[in-house]
Regions:
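Glycine- and acidic-residue-biased ligand/ion/polar-headgroup-sensing regions
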Residues: 75-78, 85-103
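Bacterial N-terminal signal peptides
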Residues: 7-17
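Short beta-strand His + acidic residue motifs that chelate non-heme Fe in jelly-roll/DSBH
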Residues: 80-82, 100-101, 117, 122-129
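Positively charged n-region of N-terminal signal peptides that target proteins for export
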Residues: 1-7
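Conserved short histidine dyad/triad with adjacent acidic residue
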Residues: 68-85, 118-120
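Double-stranded beta-helix
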Residues: 33-36, 45, 124-155
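A short, N-terminal "cap"/entry segment at the start of jelly-roll beta-barrel domains
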Residues: 23-66, 150-155
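Short acidic-glycine-tyrosine-enriched beta hairpin
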Residues: 62, 103-120
Length: 155
């Protein structure tokens, strides 16, 4: 198993400004902290125009400004070619099977699997055919997807 367990580096660049505007209701707890309780039916999914079929739900934070937590839904068979992200991110596969290619090696991650990428680690991201994929993504800075122009990944 590859030590650099791959993070789902999903693709959502410019469409984030509209997604980030979704406000989430926070409820103060008796001890002064914050609780966010969001039933699945209340989650607002937004299309990501740059990547047809991809949807994103901002749960906390603002992807255009800094650290944030999102859900990302990829259609079955989706592929994001070789790319990297500037910020570190940590993710869990909630449904579907994600397929990452890192350093020329392909790794399949079924539901319940974890992956992370530190800034600028190149990879290819796929959602296996047959079932849409959903990941929970914790990003430690602004979100971007930087294509690796002219570089082909080893398959």
């Amino acid at each position: 198993m590859n030590k650099a367990v791959v993070v789902f580096a999903l693709v959502v660049v410019a469409g984030l400004s509209t997604i980030a505007s979704q406000a989430r209701a926070a409820e103060k707890s008796k001890k002064g902290g914050t609780a966010i309780l969001m039933p699945a039916g209340d989650i607002k999914w937004t299309d990501v125009p740059q990547f047809p079929g991809v949807k994103m739900a901002v749960l906390q934070g603002d992807p255009d400004k800094g650290a944030h937590h999102t859900l990302i839904k990829l259609p079955a068979g989706f592929t994001a070619p070789l790319h990297h992200h500037t910020s570190d991110h940590y993710a869990t596969v909630l449904s579907g099977t994600m397929v990452f290619t890192v350093d020329g090696k392909e790794q399949r991650l079924p539901p319940g699997s974890y992956f992370s990428f530190t800034g600028k680690k190149t990879h290819i991201t796929k959602c296996d055919a047959g079932t849409d994929c959903v990941i929970s993504n914790d990003v430690r800075g602004k979100w971007d997807v930087v294509p690796e122009e002219g570089k082909a990944a080893k398959m």
